[in-house]
């Protein structure tokens, strides 16, 4: 499962998200929204106004969500692209 964290500098929730992803042993890509205008527009297009925004497989969320990070680790271990069952 591919995981991308869209974040900004000096963001407490972003740092907490990185720590939780690291704790779960998940690989992820960081994108700094202050340096990538296209990424910022993409995130705004999804309806988000605050960082971090995490895209994990087919799912995405905003803010520090340890419950969804744990679900992402479980989904990754099972080889699925869905974090949340629809």
What is the role of each PLM region?
Residues 27-39, 48-50:
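Thiol-based oxidoreductase modules, predominantly thioredoxin-like and allied folds used
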Residues 1-24:
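Local sequence-structure signature of Cys/Sec-based thiol-disulfide redox active-site neighborhoods
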Residues 40-44, 64:
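Short secondary-structure transition/capping segments
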Residues 8, 48, 66:
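ATP/adenylate-binding site constellation spanning eukaryotic-like Ser/Thr protein kinases
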Residues 12, 37-38, 68:
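Short alpha-helical
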Residues 44-54:
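Structural micro-motif
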Residues 19, 41, 71:
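Surface-exposed charge patches
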Residues 55-83:
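Non-catalytic, surface beta->alpha helical segment in thiol-disulfide oxidoreductase systems
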